[in-house]
Amino acid sequence: MVYISNGQVLDSRNQSPWRLSFITDFFWGIAEFVVFFFKTLLQQDVKKRRGYGGSSDSRYDDGRGPPGNPPRRMGRISHLRGPSPPPMAGGUGR
């Protein structure tokens, strides 16, 4: 990539990819990745930590947990409005 520095046109391809600043930046990038990875594994309760709600105002303090999903209904979708579908065998509906 071409860039301008102090009024001169420079090409970054001339610089070695193994210069000291690249190696140190790469090391700190890996170190930060590892730190953030383990922070996300160990700190699952982000909402309480950020002040979205404490343990005193939680609705599920007695260990019950939130309610489960409702049972799944099988069959046709009956809550949509519109014409009924044609018969499975086809035809013109006479």
Swiss-Prot record:
Gene Ontology biological process terms in this record: calcium ion transport; endoplasmic reticulum calcium ion homeostasis; establishment of localization in cell; intrinsic apoptotic signaling pathway in response to endoplasmic reticulum stress; macrophage derived foam cell differentiation; neutrophil migration; positive regulation of chemokine production; positive regulation of defense response to virus by host
UniProt modification remark: Cleaved by CAPN2/m-calpain in resting macrophages but not in activated macrophages. Macrophage activation up-regulates expression of the calpain inhibitor CAST/calpastatin, resulting in inhibition of CAPN2 activity.
Site positions for Cleavage: R81, G82
Topology class, membrane: Single-pass membrane protein
Places the protein is found: Endoplasmic reticulum membrane; Cell membrane
UniProt keyword list: Calcium, Calcium transport, Cell membrane, Endoplasmic reticulum, Ion transport, Membrane, Selenocysteine, Transmembrane, Transmembrane helix, Transport, Ubl conjugation
GO cellular component terms attached to this protein's record: endoplasmic reticulum; endoplasmic reticulum membrane; Golgi apparatus; plasma membrane
Listed GO MF terms: identical protein binding
Pfam families on file: SelK_SelG
Keyword Cell membrane listed: yes
Coiled-coil intervals: none
Region (Disordered): 48-94
Iron among keywords: no
Signal peptide as annotated in the record: none
Transmembrane stretches, start-end: 20-42
Top-level taxonomic group: Eukaryota
UniProt function note: Required for Ca(2+) flux in immune cells and plays a role in T-cell proliferation and in T-cell and neutrophil migration. Involved in endoplasmic reticulum-associated degradation (ERAD) of soluble glycosylated proteins. Required for palmitoylation and cell surface expression of CD36 and involved in macrophage uptake of low-density lipoprotein and in foam cell formation. Together with ZDHHC6, required for palmitoylation of ITPR1 in immune cells, leading to regulate ITPR1 stability and function. Plays a role in protection of cells from ER stress-induced apoptosis.
Quaternary assembly: Interacts with DERL1, DERL2, DERL3 and SELENOS. The SELENOK-SELENOS complex interacts with VCP. Interacts with ZDHHC6.
Family: Belongs to the selenoprotein K family.
Protein name as annotated: Selenoprotein K
Species name: Rattus norvegicus (Rat)
